Regions:
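N-terminal signal-anchor module of multipass membrane proteins
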Residues: 1-36
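Juxtamembrane membrane-water interface segments that cap and precede transmembrane helices
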Residues: 8-20, 152-169, 230-238
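Membrane-embedded alpha-helical segments of multi-pass membrane proteins
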Residues: 28-35, 78-90, 178-185, 242, ...
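Structural signal for the C-terminal ends of transmembrane alpha-helices
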Residues: 40-48, 94-100, 188-198, 259-267
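Internal alpha-helical transmembrane segments
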Residues: 41-46, 50-120
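Solvent-exposed interhelical
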Residues: 53-55, 93-106, 189-211
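Long hydrophobic alpha-helical segments that form multi-pass transmembrane helix bundles
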Residues: 108-186
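Alpha-helical transmembrane segments of multi-pass integral membrane proteins
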Residues: 235-268
Length: 268
C-alpha cells in the first residue's frame, strides 16, 4: 500500500468500503443460507419422487462438507462459515417431514432471536445478570499471534482448531446461529411453496415482500442504531443484536425480491 494517498482517494476508498459493507455485510451469507435451505428442498423432493428419504444421504453430504470446510479454513484464520452451516443443517434433517405450517412457525421463532431476548429478560429480573463469556476476543487474539509468528504448521493446525472454534462461538454471540437455522427453514418453505416458480400470484407475493421489507428496513435500522448507543453492553449484545439481525434480514428480502422481479424483465 502507498504510505500516503491523496485526500480525494482516501474519501473515495472509504465511500466504496462503506457502501459495499452496508450492501453485502450480513446479507450475502443470509442469501446463501436461504439458498442452502432451498437446495435441500430440491434434492429432498427429487428423492421423494423416487420413493426415497433424502435425510440420511444429506447427513453424509454434510460430513463431506465439514471436511471441505476444514480444508478451506486451514488457510483462512477467521474460520469458515461452512462449518456453521454443517452444524445448523441438522435442523433440516429434523424437520424434513414436518408440515409447511410447522416449518414456517419454527422459522419465525428462530428469527425472533429467542436466546438474545432470554438474556435481556433475565437481566430485567436480576440487574447483576451477565452474559455467558464465550471468550471470542481472547481466541481471536491467539489466532492473530500464531498468524503473525509465521510458522506454517502452527498456522494450519490453529486455523482448523482454534480458528474454527472462534468462528462458531462468534456466530453464537452475534445471533447468527439461530438466524441461520431460521433462514434454512425459510429457504425450505420457499421451495415447498414453489415461490421461485414464475406465476402471477408468486410475483405478487414477491412484490408485497419487497414493499414490506423496504418499509421495515428503515425503522429497524434506526432502532438498532439507537440501541447500540446504549451505555449497557448487555442491551447492545441482546436487544441490539436482535434488531441488527432483523434489519439485515429485511434488507436481504429486499435484495432477493428485487432479483426475482428483475429476472422477469427482458432487459435484465
Amino acid at each position: 500500500y502507498p504510505e500516503s494517498s491523496p485526500e480525494w482517494l482516501t474519501i473515495l476508498d472509504a465511500g466504496v468500503f462503506n457502501a459495499t459493507f452496508s450492501l453485502l455485510a450480513g446479507k450475502s451469507y443470509a442469501i446463501f443460507a436461504l439458498l442452502f435451505g432451498f437446495t435441500f428442498y430440491i434434492q429432498s423432493h427429487n428423492q421423494q419422487l423416487k420413493g426415497k428419504d433424502f435425510g440420511y444421504r444429506f447427513l453424509w453430504r454434510m460430513i463431506l462438507l465439514a471436511g471441505f470446510a476444514t480444508l478451506n479454513a486451514a488457510f483462512f484464520p477467521a474460520g469458515d462459515v461452512l462449518l456453521l452451516f454443517v452444524v445448523v443443517s441438522l435442523v433440516l434433517f429434523i424437520v424434513r417431514k414436518w408440515s409447511d405450517k410447522a416449518i414456517l412457525i419454527t422459522a419465525i421463532l428462530f428469527s425472533l432471536q429467542p436466546i438474545e431476548w432470554f438474556h435481556y429478560i433475565m437481566s430485567l429480573f436480576n440487574p447483576a445478570y451477565t452474559l455467558p463469556d464465550l471468550n471470542v476476543g481472547a481466541m481471536y487474539a491467539e489466532v492473530a499471534e500464531y498468524t503473525k509468528a509465521g510458522n506454517f504448521w502452527d498456522f494450519l493446525i490453529g486455523n482448523v482448531t482454534l480458528g474454527q472454534k472462534a468462528s462458531l462461538f462468534w456466530a453464537i454471540g452475534a445471533g447468527r446461529f439461530l438466524q441461520t437455522a431460521g433462514l434454512f427453514l425459510f429457504g425450505l418453505y420457499i421451495g415447498r411453496k414453489e415461490l421461485f416458480v414464475t406465476t402471477e400470484s408468486h410475483l405478487k407475493f414477491w412484490m408485497k415482500a419487497l414493499i414490506i421489507a423496504a418499509i421495515s428496513f428503515a425503522p429497524l435500522y434506526s432502532l438498532k442504531e439507537q440501541i447500540m448507543q446504549s451505555d449497557s453492553s448487555l442491551i447492545q449484545q441482546t436487544v441490539g443484536t436482535a434488531f441488527d439481525m432483523w434489519q439485515k434480514f429485511a434488507f436481504t428480502i429486499v435484495l432477493v425480491a428485487s432479483f426475482v422481479l428483475l429476472y422477469q424483465k427482458d432487459q435484465f
